[in-house]
Amino acid sequence: LGGHVEELVKDEGLVSQSDLPFKGDIDIDKLEACIEKEGADNVSFMRLEAGTNLIGGQPVSVQSFKDACAVARKHGILSVLDASLLQDNLYFIKIRDEERKDMSVRDITREIADQFDMIYFSARKFGFARGGAILVRDEELFHSMEDLVPMFEGFLTYGGMSVREIEAMTVGFDESMDMDIISHGPQFIKYCVDKLVD
C-alpha cells in the first residue's frame, strides 16, 4: 500500500547563483518520464506547490502550472495545488512575468486556479486566518471526501470553523489580491538580503 514522492523541479531551479525567474517550475520531460516509468494508473495525483518550499519558496510560473496540468489531464491524473504560499508566488508572477504584468492579481489567481482539479491551503499562510480549505472541481470527488471530514474536522452540518474565522479568512483573501499587501514579505526579505550583502 506504500507510495513515494518524486521531486520534479527543473535542474536549473537547484542552482543558487542563478537569475532564473521561476526556479520552482516543473520539468515537464521529467514528469512525462515519471508517468511513463510508473504507469499513469499508479500515479495517484500530481501535486504542485505555489512557492516551492523544498527549494526555499521559489516561485512557479503560470506557464509551468499550465504545462504540468495539461500532462496530468492527458494521462487522467488528478492535479492538486498546495496554495498555502500562493501570495508570494503571485507577487513574483506579477513582477517577473512580462505577459502578466498588466493583469490584476485576482485575474492571475483565477488563471492558476482554472488549471487544477483540487486546491488546498492553510489559511494561516494564505488568507491571514485560522483554518484552511480544500477546493475541488468535481462533485463526485467532493462527495467522496465527506466521510473523512468528521474524522478530522467536525460534522458536515455543524462544527469545524466558526463564522468569525470564515469571515476573517474572506477578508484575508480579499487582501491577498492587493499587490501592496502581498509585496510586504518578498520586499522585506530583499531588504534584509541587501543589508547582509552590504
Name each model-derived stretch.
Residues 1-198:
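Conserved PLP-enzyme active-site core in the AAT-like
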